[in-house]
């Protein structure tokens, strides 16, 4: 049973209409992938989805499966996520160096780990879920 698919660095093709293996648990896209994903039907059992360095597409209307526990967005991702309907199962969320949109974000109640690699804006008005155990900011954070 296929559980992991890892697309190489140069992969940058549409994944709309792809029928994923039902057993898929881990899906990773290489550094050049930058295709729209709002219409993608994700595998029902996928737990971890990782986007590479150049991914920078809106995700506000993505229908994430209930099984997702970890989402990782690469360096270029910089779209607002305040309208994203995160799955309740999401425990780990990672954003890369270009992400600057924490205010107004609806975070899942079970989120335990949040990484914002180069976030450097005030966080005094950011609402953190009670479940959060690990919060990481990069070296440039000074607020």
Please name every model-derived segment:
Residues 1-3, 20-26, 42-48, 64-70, ...:
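Leucine-rich repeat
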Residues 4-13, 28-35, 50-57, 72-79, ...:
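Concave beta-strand-loop units of leucine-rich repeat
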Residues 13-20, 35-42, 57-64, 79-86, ...:
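Short, T/G/N/S-enriched strand-turn elements that build extracellular solenoid repeat scaffolds
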